Swiss-Prot record:
The modification N6-acetyllysine is found at K29. InterPro entries: DAP1/DAPL1. Ribosome-binding protein involved in ribosome hibernation, a process during which ribosomes are stabilized in an inactive state and preserved from proteasomal degradation. Acts via its association with eiF5a (EIF5A and EIF5A2) at the polypeptide exit tunnel of the ribosome, preventing mRNA translation. Involved in ribosome hibernation in the mature oocyte by preventing mRNA translation, leading to ribosome inactivation. Ribosomes, which are produced in large quantities during oogenesis, are stored and translationally repressed in the oocyte and early embryo. Coiled coil: none annotated. GO terms for biological process: apoptotic signaling pathway; autophagy; negative regulation of autophagy; ribosome hibernation. Residues 32-43 have a biased composition (Basic and acidic residues). This is Death-associated protein 1. It comes from Bos taurus (Bovine).
Length: 102
C-alpha cells in the first residue's frame, strides 16, 4: 500500500483519521504549530494569581492553630498499639483424629 499524498490530507474534525491495523485503531500524534504554544504561555503569565488564602479550621467552635493544639508527639502516642500486660498463649489442645473401625 502506498502512503497518502503529502499535498492533500483528508481531515476529520480538524485532524487526520486514525489508522486501522490488525483490527484496532491506532492514533497518530502530530505536533501542533509552535505559535499557539507561545500565545498560550503569554496568556497564562498574564492571568497568574497568588494561591487563595487557606480557610480557618474550627474545632468545637474554637479556631484550630495546627501543631500548637495537637503536637506530633501526642498524635504518635494515640496511634501506637497498647502492649498486653499478660502474655497469653493458646491452651494446648489434644488432637483427636477420627479413625474407621476394624
Amino acid at each position: 500500500m502506498s502512503s497518502p499524498p503529502e499535498g492533500k490530507l483528508e481531515t476529520k474534525a480538524g485532524h487526520p483519521p486514525a489508522v486501522k491495523a490488525g483490527g484496532m485503531r491506532i492514533v497518530q500524534k502530530h505536533p501542533h504549530s509552535g505559535d499557539t504554544r507561545e500565545e498560550k504561555d503569554k496568556d497564562d503569565q498574564e492571568w497568574e494569581s497568588p494561591s487563595p488564602p487557606k480557610p480557618t479550621v474550627f474545632i468545637s467552635g474554637v479556631i484550630a492553630r495546627g501543631d500548637k493544639d495537637f503536637p506530633p508527639a501526642a498524635a504518635q502516642v494515640a496511634h501506637q498499639k497498647p502492649h498486653a500486660s499478660i502474655d497469653r498463649h493458646p491452651s494446648p489442645r489434644t488432637q483427636h483424629i477420627q479413625q474407621p473401625r476394624k
